[in-house]
């Protein structure tokens, strides 16, 4: 066993019997306590051949994969040291790969603990991008995150944002500018989507932004409605939703990039250099010097550093984007004025009042591509509506000129026959993504087609593809087809174009002529020369073709004919791909390709057209196509057990297809196969796929036992990553919709989640916050739908003014048959107005009537220990305001304030005071109640309660006598009496003789 910790290894000391050893590490650089780590295991050790200060540790038999995965890691060190003009701040660096951790990367001082699943061999393609970026992120966090750490919780955006920004620069160097810009665009879209769903993310909530300056003669702006905020505190990392933290990192990265555009990349890197230099100097001093504060970074320190280096005051920027949440949302439309040769632009911010969206005031860049080139215009946006007349530099020469200069300087030939008289080819808003924004541009379909074909920016091409989904025309079909075939086009644009063509083809199904979309393209690219139907042997040396070969079959599987089913030619084509798949001479693994083919089979499945109710699904009842799909999936799933592939990607795809077949009625809906694959010991990706299917099954067909299975696993599974991922799956696909009656919506569920949140997960803040998200998804911030509303009980049953009753019904120990008895008793009761009492703590008290004055009411309580049990949380019919010290109320279910805990003298033992005169008092009270026609009746355990309907019809005198008789019966049998507003006990059997009698006295 080897122990790995922070700092330099000084010595290893063995005990005399050589059975134990002690590792001594020394860290000479000051470090925060959370940045100290320890990893112990039977590690294999590999010293980096390029940088001897770097050591790698992995579990047994993974050393070959480790050498491949970390082969180019030294380049990241060199890149960071070069752009930051600073040496790596520590004397060594250790990478430890371990199993069963929650996060893929965990950075600590001088060491990082990474997930074993990041390792890969030379035969794997897809994982390389993920692993390289993850290792680069871990190294970047050594500079900002470990060496320079946050000053307060609210400053966490700085180390997260700076380290991710540096990782992005390295990714741009490794994978190219197109990959980098597509990554930035996807992060921006993710932040926008999250903020519009939940609210604006405030990166630094510790200080409110400064108020905007207002001129003396300018009227004050109308105050904006206060943001309701999130359903969790955002000032501490241990209370934030894990999803919120994930999106906060992305937003912090984007804000750093915005800062780069405002002060320049070189100056921003100088700011980082200054902070590192000050910290490196402070690290060599003793704590008495008072310089260690330079090793902490805060928003104010960062703003001052920018001012020191650049001379620019960025306080307005900080207030606008760091201390204020939300993003801008623009809608752009334009009209070409032929007479004046101008473009009349209109930019609206109509949705500025909606959640997560705010009004933007400031400069906004608009790029107009004209016949004579690209022209950049900067508009000043001040209100929610901005108009501008922009003079065009070129006139419409549709048939005179075809060489069009682009923003890159190159000239391209364009077919201008689709144009009208406008010289505008397309318009872009904020093309460099320099602000947090969402953009909607209204322009004709031919302009989107020009933008897709000829714009060189990948983000513009991706925007055009999204827009063309809504323009299903032959011209759009041709533009998308040309994009898929264009070898000079970025591969991710080609993949998106394939999926877009699927939607366009389905919309054009009535007029579509020829073979299914993309079939000819695939056979042209990958079919053998002699017979196009037979696919060539796999050769993944061209990565663009590899990703196309994976994606086109999945896109084609989404095609539908006029009847709404997948064309038979497509299914036959997919079966041929399985049949002729030959990877024998390929240097790369085809596991991701085979998984994609299985995913494509699942995408061809459509719901069963007609099914007779009650007919069992058998092998004979399956259609020929479904049987072929099922046989192929089963064959691959069984083959995986004999010849497992990297990360079991084929098994993951098979499980997803089996769930699709179940969901669409081709297979019996059964969770047992998924439970087997979700068991501890299976590979984590297989478990997650099985759990995803189980979560979906629970939502569609699940019973209470299925939901309990998921909750048990989320609470007790040994793998922390599985616990977290399972709850996230339940948040994304909840077992039922909020505010709708559902068979799974029970008080038991409310109690279980609530108790986990409040008392059981103090050691695991991440899982606790996951469950907070789940609770919010199911119930929001209001009373759960399965719990009766306390106010409704008050309205239905008027009560006497007075202090809350300390009575509390005592429920027997929970047994399954007791629940059935309770249900039977309620169903058999002749009283039509009975309703189930609230399982939460309702404000209770005597009936609210001024006539009753200050009469003393005494209730006799049987306290037989055999009848008593532990009340089930959420099910016990609690009518008291006396809680235990550890109790916690559900949000929105607060009763009338009263004493908390048990007070001295609250329960007074008096066995002799319960005299008949108290019965006469009760008799006179009930006469008055009957005069006012109140419907309050004591609910007893005995058969006399079935006479209550007859009692309504009797005269007042008879009623009083009946009540007196009832009270005598209760006294003789010593039955448990319940307050007016509660139901009878769950037990329908007669109570045994009481051992103790308690009196409750009300003033």
Task: Label the model's feature ranges.
Residues 458-461, 490-495, 545, 549, ...:
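Residue-level detector of extended alpha-helical repeat arrays and alpha-solenoid scaffolds
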Residues 1-21, 28, 60, 140, ...:
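Non-catalytic accessory/interaction domains
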């Amino acid at each position: 066993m080897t122990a790995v910790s922070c700092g330099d290894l000084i010595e290893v000391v063995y005990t005399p019997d050589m059975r134990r050893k002690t590792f001594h590490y020394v860290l000479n650089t000051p470090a925060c306590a959370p940045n100290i780590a320890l990893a112990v295991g039977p590690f294999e050790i590999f010293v980096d051949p390029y940088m001897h200060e770097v050591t790698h540790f992995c579990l047994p038999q993974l050393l070959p994969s480790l050498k491949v995965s970390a082969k180019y890691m030294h380049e990241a060190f060199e890149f960071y040291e070069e752009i930051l003009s600073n040496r790596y701040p520590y004397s060594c660096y250790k990478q430890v790969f371990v199993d069963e951790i929650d996060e893929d990367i965990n950075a600590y001082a001088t060491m990082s603990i990474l997930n074993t699943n990041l390792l890969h061999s030379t035969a794997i393609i897809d994982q390389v991008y993920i692993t390289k970026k993850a290792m680069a992120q871990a190294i970047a966090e050594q500079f900002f995150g470990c060496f320079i750490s946050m000053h307060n919780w609210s400053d966490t955006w700085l180390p997260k944002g700076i380290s991710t920004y540096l990782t992005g620069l390295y990714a741009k160097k490794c994978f190219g500018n197109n990959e980098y810009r597509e990554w930035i665009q996807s992060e921006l879209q993710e932040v926008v989507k999250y903020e519009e769903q939940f609210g604006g993310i405030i990166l630094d909530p510790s200080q409110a932004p400064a108020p905007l300056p207002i001129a003396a003669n300018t009227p004050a702006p109308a105050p904006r409605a206060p943001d309701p905020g999130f359903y969790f505190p955002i000032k501490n990392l241990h209370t934030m939703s894990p999803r919120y933290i994930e999106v906060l990192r992305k937003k912090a990265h984007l804000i750093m990039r915005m800062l780069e555009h405002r002060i320049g990349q070189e100056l921003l890197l100088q700011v980082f250099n200054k902070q590192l230099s000050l910290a490196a100097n402070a690290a060599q001093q003793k704590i008495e010097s008072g310089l260690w504060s330079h090793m902490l970074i805060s928003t104010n320190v960062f703003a001052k550093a920018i001012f020191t280096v650049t001379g620019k005051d960025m306080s307005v920027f900080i207030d606008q984007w760091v201390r204020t949440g939300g993003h801008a949302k623009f809608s752009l439309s334009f009209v070409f004025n032929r007479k004046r040769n101008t473009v009349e632009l209109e930019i609206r911010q109509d949705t500025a009042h909606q959640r997560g969206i705010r009004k933007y005031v400031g400069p906004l860049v608009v790029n107009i591509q004209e016949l004579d080139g690209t022209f950049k215009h900067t508009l000043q946006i001040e209100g929610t509506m901005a108009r501008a007349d922009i003079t065009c530099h070129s006139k419409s020469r549709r048939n005179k000129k075809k060489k069009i200069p682009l923003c890159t300087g190159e000239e391209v030939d364009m077919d201008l026959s689709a144009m009208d008289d406008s010289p505008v080819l397309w318009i872009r808003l904020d093309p460099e993504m320099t602000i947090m924004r969402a953009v909607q541009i209204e322009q004709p379909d031919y302009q989107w087609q020009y933008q897709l074909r000829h714009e060189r920016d990948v983000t513009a091409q991706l925007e055009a593809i999204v827009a063309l989904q809504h323009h299903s025309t032959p011209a759009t079909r041709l533009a998308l087809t040309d994009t898929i075939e264009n070898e000079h086009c970025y591969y991710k644009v080609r993949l998106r174009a394939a999926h877009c063509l699927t939607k366009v083809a389905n919309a054009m199904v009535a007029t579509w002529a020829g073979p299914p979309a993309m079939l000819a393209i695939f056979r042209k690219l990958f079919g053998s020369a002699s017979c196009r139907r037979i696919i060539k042997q796999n050769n993944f040396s061209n990565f663009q073709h590899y990703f196309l070969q994976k994606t086109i079959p999945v896109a084609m599987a989404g095609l539908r004919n006029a009847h709404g089913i997948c064309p038979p030619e497509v299914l036959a084509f997919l079966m041929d791909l399985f049949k002729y798949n030959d990877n024998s001479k390929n240097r790369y693994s085809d596991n991701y390709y085979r998984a994609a083919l299985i995913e494509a089979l699942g995408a061809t499945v459509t719901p069963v057209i007609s099914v007779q109710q009650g007919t069992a699904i058998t092998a004979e009842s399956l259609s020929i196509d479904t049987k072929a799909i099922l046989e192929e999936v089963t064959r691959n799933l069984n083959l995986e057990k004999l010849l497992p592939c990297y990360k079991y990607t084929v098994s993951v795809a098979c499980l997803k297809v089996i769930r699709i077949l179940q969901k669409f009625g081709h297979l019996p809906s059964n969770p047992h196969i998924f439970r087997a694959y979700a068991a501890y010991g299976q590979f984590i990706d297989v478990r997650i796929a099985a759990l995803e299917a189980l979560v979906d099954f629970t939502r569609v067909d699940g019973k209470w036992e299925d939901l309990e299975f998921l909750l048990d696993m989320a609470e007790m599974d040994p793998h922390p990553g599985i616990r977290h991922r399972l709850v996230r799956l339940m948040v994304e696909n909840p077992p039922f919709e909020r505010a709708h009656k559902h068979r799974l919506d029970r008080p038991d569920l409310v109690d279980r989640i609530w108790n986990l949140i409040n008392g059981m997960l103090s050691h695991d803040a991440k899982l606790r916050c996951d469950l907070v998200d789940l609770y919010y998804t199911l119930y929001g911030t209001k009373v759960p739908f399965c719990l009766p509303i306390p106010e409704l009980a008050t309205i239905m049953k008027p009560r006497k003014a007075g202090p809350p009753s300390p009575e509390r019904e005592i429920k027997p120990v929970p047994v399954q048959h007791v629940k059935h008895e309770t249900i039977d008793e309620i169903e058999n009761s002749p009283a039509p107005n009975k309703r189930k009492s609230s399982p939460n703590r309702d404000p209770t008290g005597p009936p609210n009537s001024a006539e009753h004055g200050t009469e003393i009411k005494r209730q006799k309580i049987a306290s037989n220990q055999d009848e008593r049990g532990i009340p089930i949380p959420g099910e016990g019919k609690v009518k008291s305001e006396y809680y235990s010290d550890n109790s916690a109320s559900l949000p929105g279910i607060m009763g009338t304030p009263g004493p908390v805990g048990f007070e001295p003298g609250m329960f007074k033992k008096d066995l002799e005071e319960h005299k008949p005169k108290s019965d006469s008092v009760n008799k006179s009270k009930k006469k008055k109640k009957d005069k006012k026609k109140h419907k309050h009746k004591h609910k007893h355990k005995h058969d006399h309660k079935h006479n209550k309907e007859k009692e309504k019809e009797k005269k007042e005198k008879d009623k009083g006598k009946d009540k007196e008789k009832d009270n005598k019966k209760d006294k003789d049998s010593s039955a448990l009496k319940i307050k007016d507003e509660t139901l009878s006990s769950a037990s329908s059997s007669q109570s045994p003789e009481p051992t103790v009698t308690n009196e409750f006295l009300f003033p």
